């Protein structure tokens, strides 16, 4: 195993180094990309499917830029029968809220045959990704990596000799359109567990790279190496230090990642540096990204497994695998030991232990000491007219046919003006089944005063089934937030004293554990309309999300292409003819 000296090797410079805030404006570039989004035939796991690809490939192309650069993506919709948008996950879109890529929220969907220019600045180095944000297009395969390196003249607060990127996802053989119909049916037809876990879009169905160790038994995968589903092998040299960037764009699953025989040192989370800590395995929820460092200090005559396993749900999907190939060994030389054993799927104490080890690196921005407003969001599973839905404070989100950003900016009455509730009834028991028969659909907006501090308490509860409460990773668009803490049961005022105001991590995605709460804090300093939602694709489709608006009057001229639908489109036409 990696020695403790490895951890100290990184720990000392990470503690001593101050974060640089300088940006080399003169060296910033505009990086242009021309993308066509279309359905293509592909074999992500050995079974040919129709996937949503970009420029004929799956996953989509990796974008690499430097902090301070401008990214310009000319995206053409070649889907023929449906609209499309792309969300740049983790990019705050400061000054460009219309480029956030959320249909009906920040922009109108891009119609078939149309081209939309996403132009935005990547202001902060980190590990990010992008994905579809219209219907369930992420489940259809519309995603890729977005890596932002430090700006010219800057250095990372750690050393490494090389880097790799792993984009994690899950894959169903049932198409995303059929999944949408199933989730909208009465009674509900649940989509079930994915057939395969993918690493960089590659997995193996009905066979295993580690067949001799698999339980239940699976045949050995017979690969030549050129198949679309053949694993992307990580080739390394002995006694080197590598950075592994990892992000999860799963539609459903929470995952555990491990490298056989190697410890990992976590140094980045969601584009923010953290105090380094060593782990044997790590949880990664949908919407999260990390960087870990590992040292190739094991027996150089062997290769090692890299594995991902399902967490938080009963694992009915085989683990995903690839190889850490110590050169000059052949990549066909399989490890002699079985893949790393994952923690039990419902060992939430293990998961909480990992989350509670994440602290901001010294020199990171600190949260304001007090809030101006607290919003407590209770997530429950409900029945509305017989349909199974998720609701927040008894309201299940249904996006309007009109555009939030344009409607608010130009004073168009396009959605429910009644604000959603800031809390839920005090007598609600989060530990018991509750039908919540008074739940409703809604599209109201939380109007947040500009440049104020907001606390969000995510409160989990029992679902419709007895003694069932699920993990939910929540993602905020347009912002990073401070994770102030986690707790068990129902949040109360006395829990405030448990908040970590000294070194809470900055994140854009945070998990809420079963029957527990998570406390977040952010500052409303980015004018726009921003989604805040569970990053599990079926849960968002079933209503688990809210909408925040802040400082919309400060938003500068919105590109007409982002407004060209519904009432904002009519406004454009009216102005054209007047």
From Swiss-Prot:
Which cysteines pair up through disulfides? They are: 108-565, 207-221
Q: How is the cofactor bound?
A: Binds 4 Cu cations per monomer.
Which residues belong to any copy of the Plastocyanin-like domain? 30-149, 161-328, 372-550
Subcellular location(s) per record? Secreted
Instruction: Give the gene name.
Output: AAO
Q: Which residues are glycosylated?
A: 206, 349, 394, 438, 451
The record's section on SUPFAM superfamilies has: Cupredoxins
Write out the entry's keywords from A to Z: Copper, Disulfide bond, Glycoprotein, Metal-binding, Oxidoreductase, Repeat, Secreted, Signal
Instruction: Please give the InterPro entries that the UniProt record associates with this protein.
Output: Cu-oxidase-like_N (IPR011707), Cu-oxidase_2nd (IPR001117), Cu-oxidase_C (IPR011706), Cu-oxidase_fam (IPR045087), Cu_oxidase_CS (IPR033138), Cu_oxidase_Cu_BS (IPR002355), Cupredoxin (IPR008972), CuRO_1_AAO (IPR034259)
Taxonomy of origin reads: Eukaryota, Viridiplantae, Streptophyta, Embryophyta, Tracheophyta
General function of this protein: May be involved in a redox system involving ascorbic acid.
Subunit: Dimer.
Q: Give the protein name, as stated in the record.
A: L-ascorbate oxidase
Q: What is its EC number?
A: 1.10.3.3
Catalytically driven reaction(s): 4 L-ascorbate + O2 = 4 monodehydro-L-ascorbate radical + 2 H2O
Q: Does the keyword Nucleotidyltransferase apply?
A: no
Tissue specificity, in the record's words, reads: Highly expressed in young and growing tissues.
GO CC terms: extracellular region
Q: Write out the residues that bind Cu cation 4.
A: 472, 534, 539, 544
Q: Which residues form the signal peptide?
A: 1-28
């Amino acid at each position: 195993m990696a020695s403790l000296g490895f951890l100290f090797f990184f720990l000392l410079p990470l503690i001593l180094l101050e974060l640089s805030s300088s940006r080399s404006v003169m060296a910033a570039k505009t990086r242009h990309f021309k993308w066509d989004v279309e359905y293509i035939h592909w074999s992500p796991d050995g079974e040919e499917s129709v996937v949503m690809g970009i420029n004929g490939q799956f996953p989509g192309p990796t974008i690499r830029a430097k902090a301070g650069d401008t990214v310009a993506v000319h995206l053409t919709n070649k889907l023929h029968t449906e609209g499309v948008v792309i969300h740049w996950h983790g990019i705050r879109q400061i000054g460009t809220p219309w480029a956030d890529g959320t249909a009906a929220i920040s922009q109108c969907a891009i119609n078939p045959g149309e081209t939309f220019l996403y132009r935005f600045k990547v202001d902060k180095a980190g590990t990010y990704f992008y994905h579809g944000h219209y219907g369930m297009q992420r489940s259809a395969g519309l995603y890729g990596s977005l890596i932002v390196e430090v700006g010219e003249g800057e250095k990372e607060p750690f050393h490494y000799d090389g880097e790799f990127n792993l984009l994690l996802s899950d894959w169903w053989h049932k198409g995303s359109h059929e999944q949408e119909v199933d989730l909208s049916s009465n009674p509900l037809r649940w989509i079930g567990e994915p057939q395969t876990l993918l690493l960089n879009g590659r997995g193996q169905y009905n066979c295993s790279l580690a067949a001799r160790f698999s339980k239940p038994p699976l045949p050995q995968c017979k690969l030549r190496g050129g198949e679309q589903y053949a694993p992307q092998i990580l080739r390394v040299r002995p006694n080197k230090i590598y950075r592994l960037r990892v992000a999860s764009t799963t539609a459903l699953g929470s995952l555990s990642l491990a490298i056989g025989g190697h410890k990992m040192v976590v140094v980045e989370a969601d584009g923010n540096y953290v105090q380094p800590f060593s782990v044997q395995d790590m949880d990664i929820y949908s919407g999260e990204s990390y960087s870990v460092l590992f040292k190739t200090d094991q027996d150089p005559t062997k290769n090692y497994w890299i594995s991902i396993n399902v967490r938080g749900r009963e694992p009915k999907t085989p683990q995903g695998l690839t190889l850490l190939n110590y050169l000059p060994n052949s990549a066909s030389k399989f490890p002699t030991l079985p893949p790393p054993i994952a923690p039990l799927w419902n060992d939430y104490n293990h998961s909480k232990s990992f989350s509670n080890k994440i602290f901001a690196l010294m020199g990171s921005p600190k949260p304001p000491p007090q809030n101006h407003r607290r919003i407590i969001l209770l997530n429950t599973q409900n029945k509305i007219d017989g349909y199974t839905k998720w609701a927040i404070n008894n309201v299940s989100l249904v996006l309007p046919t009109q555009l939030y950003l344009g409607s608010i900016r130009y004073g168009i009455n396009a959605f429910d003006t009644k604000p959603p509730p800031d809390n839920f009834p005090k007598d609600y028991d989060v530990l018991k089944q509750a039908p919540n028969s008074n739940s409703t659909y809604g599209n109201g907006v939380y109007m947040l005063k500009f440049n104020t501090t907001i606390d969000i308490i995510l409160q989990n509860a029992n679902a419709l089934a007895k003694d069932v409460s699920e993990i939910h990773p929540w993602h905020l668009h347009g912002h990073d937030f401070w994770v102030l803490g986690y707790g068990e049961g129902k949040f109360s005022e006395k829990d405030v004293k448990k908040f970590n105001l000294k070194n809470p991590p900055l994140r854009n995605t945070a998990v809420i554990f079963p029957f527990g709460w998570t406390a977040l804090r952010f500052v409303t300093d980015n004018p726009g309309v921003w989604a805040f939602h569970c990053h599990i694709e079926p849960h968002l489709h079933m209503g688990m999300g809210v909408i925040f608006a802040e400082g919309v009057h400060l938003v500068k001229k919105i590109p007409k292409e982002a407004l060209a639908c519904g009432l904002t489109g009519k406004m454009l036409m009216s102005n054209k003819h007047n």
